[in-house]
Amino acid sequence: MRYMTSEEIREAFLKFFEKKGHKILPSASLIPDDPQLLFTVAGMVPFKPIFWGKVEPVYTRVATCQKCLRTVDIENVGKTPRHHTFFEMLGNFSFGDYFKEEAIEWAWEFLTQVLGVPEEKLWVSVYEEDEEAFRIWNEKIGLPEKRILRMGKEDNFWGPAGPTGPCGPDTEIFYDTGYSKGCPEGEGCTPANSEGRFVEIWNLVFTEYYQDEEGKLHPLPRKNIDTGAGLERFCAMMQGVYSNFDTDLFQPIIKRIEELTGVGYKTDEEKDVSIRVIADHIRAITFLISEGVFPSNEGRGYVLRRIIRRAMRHGILLGMSEPFLYRIVDAVVEKMGKVYPEIVRGEGMVKEVLSAEENRFLKTLEQGMKVFDEIVEKKGKIDSEDAFRLYDTYGLPLELTLEIAKEKGVEVDVQEFNKYMEEQQRKSRAAMGDVEFARRYEYLEKLPKDFRTEFTGYEKLEDEGEVVLVARDDETVEEASEGTVEVVFSRTPFYAEKGGQVSDTGMVEWRDGKALVEYVFEASEGVIVHRIKILDGTLRRGQKVILRVDKKRREATMRNHTATHLLHAALKKVLGDHVRQAGSLVAPDRLRFDFTHFKGLSSAEIEQVEDLVNEWIMEAIPVEVRYTSYEEAVKSGVVALFTEKYGDVVRVVEVPGVSKELCGGTHVKNTGQIGLFKIISEESVSSGVRRIEAVTGFSALELLRNQKKLIDQLKEILGAREDELTDRVLSLREKVKELEKKLSQGRISEERIAMKQLEDGVKVFHGVFEGVEAKHLGGIADNVLKKEGEGIVILFSKFENKVSLVVKVSENLLGKYDASSIARNIAKELGGNGGGRKNFAQAGGRHPERIKDVLERLEEFLR
């Protein structure tokens, strides 16, 4: 076998299958269009709707090199030669086209003829009941029977993903590395019993059955092929190394880690583990952030934060005490940027986000480690509640707590940890309110298989359609005469909520009836559902209707959507190319735009952005819409979002010279129709993500009117001109502060302060006040001693269900009495603490109701 680089292997695979009639598609995003998955975990994920029969394939033969991310075995990453978080999966797919024979023959041809792998190095396994696959391997390929293993369902049968669905047998191809640890002598060593000698390099899945609710298998009318081969494993095979980390995919990254840490690879096994963890994790981190995932405490952001913190923890084990991961990003970009240009474009952003997260975690880790040590010192172990507190308060992932505990030889009981997590999530959901999430809309199965709603809303705001389906409470009905129902029409001008743009609303009318359209959504690919409230009449399946979109609402939404594109372009121009969309809301009354940036915008920057957007509006630039292939659109420099799903033909919305984005939303004909653009707020959403809210058109006009009314009211109240308002308000604020101080002191001076004389003749002055802030009590105590000359002053103030306390001792009594000691004694009784100097001390407590008891026993606390 000749040495091949990762680039050569990747290119050879795709070219081979292109010659076999496959359409070569670019890698889909790591963020799948699947609510059940956080990440793309396999090459077949982008094609799930096809495998499930929900979408007709554009191409029947496809091949890809797909970016994937898995964290299910993250604890093994770095400890084994082949566990990874981020990896690339080579795959060829057939959707009702070729089947087992071609899939097996082509896999064998690629391995033995293109890559030049010696035949004697290859073994396979097949499902024990799959005689067809066995026969192809044995008779067509000529593989000896002894190198074809028959395995059970657990090893060689894929799916279904749930209780029901597509499934089928698979065949796995193994490469013999010759590494013989733990393997029986002689010919007894096989992929079934070796410990690491045989590496699975390719899995061919034959999706030919459908499993029903009873577990019975039914032949599929259209059989599919789904194959997956890890590029990292192919590289190890073709580069003659046992570990994936010794391939050209990882070595440049490992060299960079060696430079930064001063620790050589393969000099110490424990340190080697840490180097491998960092080398693996930095790839995942770079790709995730470049695709718009940012560290947070939930969902994808939490997974990213967990990966970052695990990598940092291993950096600390290598002696790193400051941020360092962001300095390895360039090694990843240099190695993989030609294949995945998104990491080149996002390099600056990745470094900024990562550096900020590293700094944050170092502070958190310092605090968390102190708490960890305190808990261990007190209890000798970490229990579930402690582990959850370390996570919830100090941001230490459970996995990191377990690793630290293991290193310190400390027991960790995490049996109840998940219960605490579930309770927190329950509270979070309750705080958010009821959210409709991942409804199945099973009633849509009653629609014809290839049904798609014809959307006419780009050209029309009114159209005629036919009722195709009516559903109430997730059940189809023939007719409905009152209440809220969900309806599918044959065609509609109503825009379904998508891509951040809210849905249209309006009316549906038919002979003797009408209904209010409250919400419109796309429940499955191309099927638009209208949630309507029937006002009059009876709506029946098959009925002809007129659908009318609320024109003013649509036009306002269009203004805001086009303005969002202009805002995105302006932010890039003012702040830099690292700015990327991280979320949006386009509604008729406002727009909201989340974007990547690492600090708040200054007033000058906000003005620059506003000025740019309004300049483009005043230029009345025509907004152009065209349809093209995804590949051509990306080549032309269009902005595409990784969180959006795009088909083979895409819609490009362009404001010439300003903005060019893939977008399915509704837009104005030219920018002048937006009227006016005004930012109303700018704030942080999460680490590295900012949010701008803005208004346009009549909403902007209303904002200006309201501000003018407010200014006029202030002018009238303050008796000042507009240019005098700021100075007048500042002056009034200072006067209020001074008056509050005088008022407080004046009120207190009128209060009766009692005096108690001790046996030694010392006078103790004490008083209890309501609502006096603690900061004023010291001044009152000073006034009392000035007036009385000498003594001890003890003053209490009840404030917001708490109690504040000051103690003042005159100079001549300091040899006998200590204000700090007195304050601590009293505070302990009041459920608090305090302290200070011998002559003056302050304290606080949680039980103001105990003040009376303290005063009755005052002499006890003076000792």
Curated annotation (Swiss-Prot):
Gene3D superfamilies for this protein: 2.40.30.130, 3.10.310.40, 3.30.54.20, Bira Bifunctional Protein, Domain 2 (3.30.930.10), Threonyl-trna Synthetase, Chain A, domain 2 (3.30.980.10)
UniProt binding sites for Zn(2+): H561, H565, C663, H667
Keywords attached to this entry: Aminoacyl-tRNA synthetase, ATP-binding, Cytoplasm, Ligase, Metal-binding, Nucleotide-binding, Protein biosynthesis, RNA-binding, tRNA-binding, Zinc
Reactions listed under catalytic activity: tRNA(Ala) + L-alanine + ATP = L-alanyl-tRNA(Ala) + AMP + diphosphate
Subcellular location: Cytoplasm
Cofactor(s) the record lists: Zn(2+)
Gene Ontology terms for molecular function: alanine-tRNA ligase activity; aminoacyl-tRNA deacylase activity; ATP binding; tRNA binding; zinc ion binding
Entries under InterPro entries matching the protein: aa-tRNA-synth_II/BPL/LPL, Ala-tRNA-lgiase_IIc, Ala-tRNA-ligase_IIc_anticod-bd, Ala-tRNA-synth_IIc_core, Ala-tRNA-synth_IIc_N, Ala-tRNA_ligase, Ala_tRNA_ligase_euk/bac, DHHA1_dom
Enzyme Commission number(s) of this protein: 6.1.1.7
An annotated GO cellular component: cytosol
Cofactor note: Binds 1 zinc ion per subunit.
Enzyme class label: ligase
Record GO biological process: alanyl-tRNA aminoacylation
A Pfam family that the UniProt record links to this protein: DHHA1
NCBIfam families, sorted: alaS
Family of the protein in this entry: Belongs to the class-II aminoacyl-tRNA synthetase family.
Entry-linked PANTHER family: ALANINE--TRNA LIGASE, CYTOPLASMIC, ALANYL-TRNA SYNTHETASE
Protein task: Catalyzes the attachment of alanine to tRNA(Ala) in a two-step reaction: alanine is first activated by ATP to form Ala-AMP and then transferred to the acceptor end of tRNA(Ala). Also edits incorrectly charged Ser-tRNA(Ala) and Gly-tRNA(Ala) via its editing domain.
Domain notes: Consists of three domains; the N-terminal catalytic domain, the editing domain and the C-terminal C-Ala domain. The editing domain removes incorrectly charged amino acids, while the C-Ala domain, along with tRNA(Ala), serves as a bridge to cooperatively bring together the editing and aminoacylation centers thus stimulating deacylation of misacylated tRNAs.
Protein name stated in the entry: Alanine--tRNA ligase
Species per Swiss-Prot/TrEMBL record: Thermotoga maritima (strain ATCC 43589 / DSM 3109 / JCM 10099 / NBRC 100826 / MSB8)
